[in-house]
């Protein structure tokens, strides 16, 4: 690395040695991030200086130019409507240009600039911050060109800012911390950074940067070529994407485009797609083995790191061991990877996982394999789902088709592989969905706009979801059981298709937030209440439809050889939690029906409530999976 300094006689002085040491420490801490962002090493020395001393010198090199084309409105009503729009007054455009008489040189070590962040938040907190943080709404409205009068936050202005923010938002996420702390953060650059416009041939690059010593996030700006006075500073809003069609979709928030001519069909991906997932997961498939017979009454030694199992498995046929070498059963919380080694060295060891079970438990894979049952649009028991990484153009086309037909267009964005509704967002804003693609890998699913509701006497008609525990004994032959007890989760506020960021209205997971009320209704209390509210729908009939959906799901998941389907490994067993809702639908004959909608399949689910209210839960699970004894267990065979 070159360290720029003037000529010095003799050996380096103390200050230079100190600077060199500080730079080494800086590179040790931040070098990987800077390299990943493409920041040239020649700029690192001055970057450190500017970070240490909080040097914001972009104003010495650049200026903001405003271009406005005013069109006469036809009448006062039209002018008033125009004033309420973002960027009132016609085509209002800002540009950042080089104002330094000497221009900007890409090889100048000083050609890196800090951009401050005007607003940083997580999406679920945005509305509250706009309403409560002094001056924030006013600043954001001004930055976005939204007219704002008075001091009291107007709901209309708040709504406009929340809609327009997706044209200005950038994102990063922390690499370390809890699952909650790693949820992506969205930020809006200051007035200078937010005025930098898009170009497919950008003159500058930007990257978010978290300076750890001061725990402050900035955006770094540096030139990609030399610029003369008056030239525009631009960046690529779809940086890193080469595919022209994907770029067109990514740029829709700023460059509207009609995608109606594009097919929104999403057939199941080819075999190589699943092979790539297998390799990315570093999962090694097992060799073929024969089931190992054990003597009558054999006591199984269980190596387990799941606390709920350790605390509640009391069946006399199972005992715990700390030694993996002595174990008959591995019941592990983390995902197992090297099935090949296990099949070679310990084929007799049973375990609580199947090779390739991510096809069920990861949301994009679940949507892909489900198309085997329902074709490109998916089966009736899974909401229409698109993988935003691989199916963005199809989704945009589908969204625009629904919009043109006047159909409901509420969607829910979910990370591929997070539970507890983390980083999950309900929206009808296409720009928001497109931009969410830039954070973590996500799917977008049709939001259930007509859910079957449950009347809570203390609240009103609320959303609810149902969790079933299913036990997969084997793939070939396919043997699947459901635990007889199911669990219910309820929203805390009456359902309506508004206030889409109101967690307690649109979500049901309440047991992880100590400040939120958890409504507890046991299954045996729920069934008579449900049948009283919906006398035409006996619960036995509803559950039969639910089990029919489970049957189809596992049939398609096991229909193809790995990595396109679950692997038939004789030593594998598994317990999954399936979360679902009920949706009102109409059959072709006009009959109104409750259609189960599978939301997700969870590996190693939290069974705290099961253990608390049903002490025999894990005894039943282990008897079913490992002993093939179900007569005295609370399970029902589905397949």
UniProtKB/Swiss-Prot annotation:
Binding site residues for ATP: 445-448, 463, 465
Matching Gene3D superfamilies: ATP-grasp fold, B domain
Superkingdom classification of source: Eukaryota
Cellular-component GO terms for this entry: centrosome; cytosol; midbody; nucleus; plasma membrane; spindle
UniProt KW keywords: ATP-binding, Cytoplasm, Cytoskeleton, Immunity, Innate immunity, Nucleotide-binding, Nucleus
Keyword Nucleus in annotation: yes
Major subcellular location class: cytoplasm
Domain TTL residue range list: 295-639
Places the protein is found: Cytoplasm; Midbody; Cytoplasm, Cytoskeleton, Microtubule organizing center, Centrosome; Cytoplasm, Cytoskeleton, Spindle
Disulphide bond pairs: none
GO function term, MF aspect, one: acid-amino acid ligase activity
Pfam families the UniProt entry points to: TTL
Key word Nuclease present: no
One Gene Ontology biological process: negative regulation of type I interferon-mediated signaling pathway
Tissue expression profile of the protein: Widely expressed with highest levels in brain, kidney, liver, lung, muscle and testis.
Purpose of the protein: Negatively regulates post-translational modifications of tubulin, including detyrosination of the C-terminus and polyglutamylation of glutamate residues. Also, indirectly promotes histone H4 trimethylation at 'Lys-20' (H4K20me3). Probably by controlling tubulin and/or histone H4 post-translational modifications, plays a role in mitosis and in maintaining chromosome number stability. During RNA virus-mediated infection, acts as a negative regulator of the RIG-I pathway by preventing MAVS binding to TBK1 and IKBKE.
Family: Belongs to the tubulin--tyrosine ligase family.
Subunit note: Interacts with MAVS; the interaction prevents MAVS binding to TBK1 and IKBKE. Interacts (via N-terminus) with TBK1 (via protein kinase domain). Interacts (via TTL domain) with IKBKE (via protein kinase domain). Interacts with tubulin alpha. Interacts with histone H3 and histone H4 (when trimethylated at 'Lys-20' (H4K20me3)). Interacts with CBX3.
Protein name: Tubulin--tyrosine ligase-like protein 12
Naturally occurring in which organism (per UniProt): Mus musculus
Species classification: Eukaryota, Metazoa, Chordata, Craniata, Vertebrata
